[in-house]
Amino acid sequence: MEIAKIIGREILDSRGNPTVEVDVHLACGIIGRAAVPSGASTGENEAIELRDQDKARYCGKGVLKAVKNVNEVIDPALCGMSVLEQTAIDRKLIELDGTKTKSNLGANAMLGVSLAVAKAAAAYLDIPLYRYIGGSNTYVLPVPMMNIINGGSHSDAPIAFQEFMIRPVGACCFREGLRMGAEVFHALKKVLHDRGLSTAVGDEGGFAPALNGTEDAIESILKAVEAAGYVPGKDITIAMDCASSEFFKDGIYDYTKFEGEKGKKRSIDEQVAYLTELVGKYPIDSIEDGMSENDWEGWKKLTVALGDKVQLVGDDLFVTNVEFLRRGIAEKCGNSILIKVNQIGTLTETLNAIEMAHRHGFTSVTSHRSGETEDTTIADIAVATNSGQIKTGSLSRTDRMAKYNQLLRIEEELGPCAVYGYKKV
């Protein structure tokens, strides 16, 4: 079970940008492999991914420095350690880096190693990754939050909000939920096509048409839900990722950044009122980053207004970090945390954030990034932690479907023990 060799390499993600892949070799011959995702809209408090900044290679986005850190710094430090000591290994990685933001080794280097170690350990014990991470009390299949219309930084569509998602909450199992989502996705394609709108897809596999703002996006989705034969609000609900940090400046939520002259400029109170209006008008049950990461007062106001009605998910606000989550719990900001493994940089710290959230009555949503790979680790993490919810894109692009297909396999493996669902706020 000893780690014999750790090898890092540069591969490409779903956007054609370099990322880190790591192989952890055990003395017995077993190998664990993990690839690291990357985000487009990032919270300013996220752990730092190390990029080469060499404009002559990959427009400065190469990761050879991070790979070198894996091969020349991390490998000699971890060789000989037991692969089953995940917490000790992650602690060693944090000590080796020595910075709060993981800017020395790079969060991409550290995460690749951390996840590959877990995969090698699961393979050594001959058990599924979700079982290794979560133990015997692992049985909840997540409700998929499917990003079928992309806006904001994830597309060229003139919509400020970044993601419009469907949640098949009325399904009896994950398999049926996935089918419902796929049928709505195809119905939406026809709705857009019939309007003469583009059906090209964005980074996360959702459509990126030139719609007339937020309400048009939501109403197009509702039309597709009904066309697919489902009841909005009963079978399928709507979730949004506003990514408000992307257009918040000097106390103003400036929609013109993405929507041009037709966009509005809203004060903090007006932003809260607008989101409250949308929730009253449409079957929305989850809002992510409705307020900016730097607008803690706005978050408090939004939680007072909507916290007992919908799930208010902190992504940029919490960045999968117990320090920021602790503040959010104390100040009553939000009621849910988005979990992105590369925001914090190790598996142990990720699990600590999920545990803290659940302990204080928060829900958690396991999430991909806009720059993904064929790696399916987050599917196993979602089941391992019984989070009951996963964000991993739309119903297109293999980098997204890989996670959904892994969840189908896990549900089949769990058999009658599998439960589909999430904790309602």
Swiss-Prot record:
Pfam families: Enolase_C, Enolase_N. Belongs to the enolase family. (2R)-2-phosphoglycerate binds at residues 162, 340, 369-370, 391. It catalyses: (2R)-2-phosphoglycerate = phosphoenolpyruvate + H2O. One of its GO terms (biological process) is glycolytic process. Mg(2+) binds at residues 241, 288, 315. Catalyzes the reversible conversion of 2-phosphoglycerate (2-PG) into phosphoenolpyruvate (PEP). It is essential for the degradation of carbohydrates via glycolysis. Its cofactor is Mg(2+). Its EC number is 4.2.1.11. One of its GO terms (molecular function) is magnesium ion binding. Pathway: Carbohydrate degradation; glycolysis; pyruvate from D-glyceraldehyde 3-phosphate: step 4/5. Transmembrane segments: none annotated. Gene3D superfamilies: Enolase-like C-terminal domain, Enolase-like, N-terminal domain. CDD domains: enolase. GO terms for cellular component: cell surface; extracellular region; phosphopyruvate hydratase complex. Binds a second Mg(2+) ion via substrate during catalysis. PROSITE patterns: ENOLASE. It is an enzyme of class 4 (lyase). This is Enolase. It is found in: Cytoplasm; Secreted; Cell surface. SMART domains: Enolase_C (SM01192), Enolase_N (SM01193). Keywords: Cytoplasm, Glycolysis, Lyase, Magnesium, Metal-binding, Secreted. Its main location: cytoplasm.
